[in-house]
Amino acid sequence: MKVIHLISGGDTGGAKTHIHYLLSGLSKEIDVTLVCFMRGEFSDEAEALGIPTVVLEGSIPSVLKQLKTMIREEHYDLIHSHGARGNFIASLLKGPCGLPMVTTVHSDPKLDYLARPGAALVYGTLNDHALKKADYLVGVSDSMKSLLISRGFSANEIFSIYNGVDFSVVPENPDRLAYLRALGLECDEQSVIVGIAARLDPVKDIGTLIRGFALAEKKQPQLRLVIAGDGAQMEELRALAQGLGVEKKVCFAGWRSDVNTLMAALDVNTLTSLSETFPYAITEGARAHLATVSSRVGGVPKLVIEGETGFLFPAGDAAALGEKLARLAADPALRRRMGEALYEKARREFSVEATTRRQLDIYDEVLRRERLKKSGARRGVVIIGAYGMGNSGDDAILEAIVGELRQIDPFLPITVLSRRPKETRERYGVESLHMFDFAGFHRVLKGTQLYLSGGGSLIQNVTSRRSLWYYLYTISQAKKCGNRVMMYGCGIGPIADERDTQRICRILNENVDVITLRESASLQELQRCGVTKPAMAVTSDPALTLPEAPADIVTAELEKFGLAPDGSYICFSVRGWTGFDEKAKAFAEAADYAAETLGLTPVFMLINRDEDGPATDEVRALMETNAAVIDGERNSSLTIGLLARMKAVVSMRLHGLIFAASQGVPLVGVSYDPKVTAFLASIGEERCLPLEELTAENLKAAVSAASAAYGDRDTRKRTADALADAESENSAWARKLLGL
């Protein structure tokens, strides 16, 4: 494999480090050539590292002519560009040379020229044009991939990579006090040194660092701060430090080329950026075993796990930063423990070897796709379900399925039909079409291998016959267009209108290869309908495999709704349904009972943010005690994390029960649909009350029993874990149908 890399040659900071590390690793595995458009520190260092480097200076027409000759004579397979100038030149070369163009996006293009409107107008515009011409984009971190998707780039043509560092390098500073004093810092043996290496630009938000440091220093006067970097904000930041009265404890060290020596002189590494991809400042600090405090931006949470490998704070929140710095300053053992944990995680997952391997895998995937385009072979999956309709349960199923497919093949192109395709693209990192874009659907089916009817109760007609006909139509069209067809961890029924039974039987028997079901009741319904030809297996709901969100994220969400993180709560999840109005009073009395007798604060959670509000309001209006409402948009992991904080959960919504069951929380199910009864039976849960039989007394009794059962949480979680293990059969069948 031969790859030509194009870059201006004037780059500094993380982009320079990334390319030097990456090409040093790649040059040991494949033929790479680095082309710079100016000679300077960048090209000199690349040559010193042994990277084959060519400097082409001159006009754009002259450079293009030379590059076309190089590419033709050297038989390159790929053009890989970096930065505005490299991207622009690559966009002019890809057509004439007939090569795919891969572009790495190292930072947010809209922030690259912050406070430089002239440069933004010229270089930013050229870069925007070039990025749209690229065949494939590589975002430095998953967050950059998400950002590019939100800007309208195709999710299936974007890959992610993380900056890796060379862990064979050991940062050393034998006389750190002398070094720090030489920088101009007043310090002694008792000083705790906080540092940052960053440009003094607005996006790095050094002002928040200084404000947070000033707050921490009031509690821990031994703190000192070293700011290593240069930029337009230097005088503004000096004035800020003076205004806060910490100018004698803050050292502006200017730009430092001896980053490893600097890191070895610190006790705490920091990052305060408003936006990042995956900054080297974090991994370089990890290599030096430094305790780290970072803003929660970009891919940083992949490495810095709150309370384990470091501390995170909301970008721009000086008070939160100050609290973390003060805590680390007061506890040397905590600094050592976090520094070691960060080092071990970074060494395992974010080494230069891991980055090199990832880039090689991306190249292999790009070349494979180019070959498939030429041969007309199929690749990819299309998923259909009740997605983008505001229901946390259905969206959780999609999240789980996408995660399982990524484990099968991390580069698998995935397209999802959704009611809100933009939201689906951005949230799950997949391509998405509107569910009624039939022309687009047929176009996608002509190139995919596998159609997945993705979980949930799609084959039912109790809510609508038309929705049933829609899903059956998509199944038949998928098979007609040459796809394998799988119904993935789904529920079946109720089939209330028997006029549809024959159609269900015919279409499923003729078109479906595999059906996996979330409980045995669904298998019985299929058998009753006469479905016999597909391979069928009882597994479980894909959503059971989803993790809960990190503890600090859950705590912040509780506090947003005025709930103490250590409070005692009972959750209610209700929905509108036939006969609900007559039962709303029973829910209200049970919630009041939980508050007044059991000491549990009622919390209502909207699982379907579009539909559950009116039913929730109806119950709350009938209550005598106060109750909180958790509403708004949130991902599945956060919903699971919130439910994990409850002492008991009372839910009509199936996925409210599934999420809570996965965390071992005691349940009370109010069944309006056989799927609720079937799930509770599958986990051996007896507290299931049919909606039509619900009374205040039997609901209060169930709530009391659930509250009393809280201490036996581990037993219930083992049952849910067993179901999660059974769920793996879903992805095993998908792997088989994909031929992997």
Regions found by a protein language model. Give the residues of each.
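Active-site anion-handling motifs in enzyme catalytic cores
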Residues: 369-740
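A conserved mid-protein helix/loop that constitutes part of the nucleotide-sugar donor-binding site
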Residues: 13-24, 192, 196-218, 232-238, ...
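A short, active-site helix/loop in glycosyltransferases that binds the activated sugar's phosphate group
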Residues: 132-159, 165-169, 515-533
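Nucleotide-sugar donor phosphate/pyrophosphate-binding loop at the beta->alpha transition
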Residues: 61-65, 100-102, 110-133, 146, ...
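Short His-centered aromatic/hydrophobic patch
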Residues: 81-87, 105
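Aromatic "clamp/platform" in nucleotide-sugar-dependent glycosyltransferases that forms part
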Residues: 255, 274
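N-terminal strand-loop element at the rim of the active site
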Residues: 5-61, 144-149, 159, 232, ...
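Conserved acidic donor-binding segment of nucleotide-sugar-dependent glycosyltransferases
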Residues: 306-307, 311-318, 327-332, 687-694, ...
